[in-house]
Amino acid sequence: FILRKTFFLSIIFFLSFSFLGIAQNDQDLIPLKSMAPDGIGPLSLPHLRHMVLGSAFVYNGDCPDLFIAGTGKTTELYLYKWLRNTENGVPIFDKPHKIASPFKLKGTIFQTDDHNVHALWLKKDSVIHTVFNLKKQSFDRIGGIELPELASLPQSIAARINKDQSVDLFLELVGHSIPAKYANQNPSSKEWRPYDEAGVSTTPLHYTYLCNIRYPRLLSGTPSVKQMVTHSRKETRWGMMNIAMVTLRKNDMQELICGSRLGNFTYYSRPELSQDTLSPRHYVVGSDNILLQHPSISASVCSYVDVKSGTTNIIAGGEGAVYFYKYSGEFTLDGHPVFSQPSPVLQVDADLYCGTLPVPSVIDWDGDGIEDIIVGNSDGHVLFFKNIGNNNNPRFIPKGRVQADGKDIHIQAGYSGSVQGTPESRWGYLSPTVVDWTGDGLPDIIMGDITGKYTLYVNKGTRTEPKLDAPQPF
């Protein structure tokens, strides 16, 4: 019992603190490593959220390397060196290296034909220009400009160098807004009312849109400003997170894919040298023509070139793992680009990644006499990690998402499921407790989640092959 309790508490403390980005004492907390073949597992940082900022051929490999910022209690910028791809084309990266930079968020990273890696950072109404120094592993400031007067402070930025060496900056601005119905409310107060009598959200709502500034050269010369290049000021609810320049059609087009807080990806295009309004908003879809939605909230996005085709795939981060979306080379008849379903981006020597805000339950799940881990997370999934070691020396491999009634368990708040209101719609906050509730010798799951409800998942399988039934509310 003492061993189990100590092991369980160690997991609780490690998972709770490491994924909040709280500084750790290496002597106190040792991350559990993935025991998957070659130690390969989902790319992850000890932070609450992953913000992908760009890719570039830093180490002259066959595929680009990746820049990611980790945010939470602390914010740091990291560089991942590309090592190889899986058979399905998913990139595998080396362990992350921390990068020094005067700024770490609200930026875009791109590479020019001279192989220099640039980063442009937003600082209120200015853009700061830095260049990557490989030897120093840092972005060094080389200049900056004050932006022309815009309708709002920019929220994110992307840069495109055109064939005539002019440079287009695309900036995300705050557009249409709806104030809160009730003033001076705090979610911690007894007066808090996230929904009115009709069940309609009372929380504030805002949308963002794109503007365009063209410079004759990179941040130099007299700019040409187009205050709005989208068809409305109501393009993306609660923000785009960031903007990626992509190449899908390969016919002298400017193409953009934007992330979003809710996890959808929007697509825009126009002829390269025009400064016309972008095409109407389209969405990234799957092969079934259904919109792709990132597995977690706050999806940031960057382009990731396919060196064989010359087109770009995308990599997206958020509050959870970082995912790879492969471009199919096709558009739907009505103009939506088709991408694959997301696959986790991988790294070597990976820590055991359970998602953000994991809640573990230690149990012998598969009846082999060795204690495994069942984990719920903020994405709204439940994961199974099998112990291939023993209880004195546990070694875990990820075995995927736990299912109920033949489907992955996936719970999120939706429009009205959170006491904090609709901004929490993409969170699940699953808290599984594994226990033999029915007394038949099989482990069942009692689940708490963001909705405040508790549900029971009865195990109708066998001791060695658990099979959960559909959930039953308490």
Identify the residue ranges that each predicted region occupies.
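Post-signal peptide N-terminal segment of secreted/secretory-pathway proteins
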Residues: 54-57, 63-134
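Exposed, low-structure sequence patches enriched in small/polar residues
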Residues: 316-317, 364, 370-371, 375-377, ...
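Short glycine/acidic-enriched loop and turn motifs that connect beta-strands
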Residues: 71-75, 124-127, 175-180, 261-265, ...
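Hydrophobic beta-strand segments that make up the repeating blades of beta-propeller
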Residues: 66-71, 117-123, 169-172, 254-260, ...
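Blade-edge motifs of beta-propeller repeat domains
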Residues: 24-49, 81-103, 132-151, 191-201, ...
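Bacterial Sec-dependent N-terminal signal peptides
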Residues: 1-26
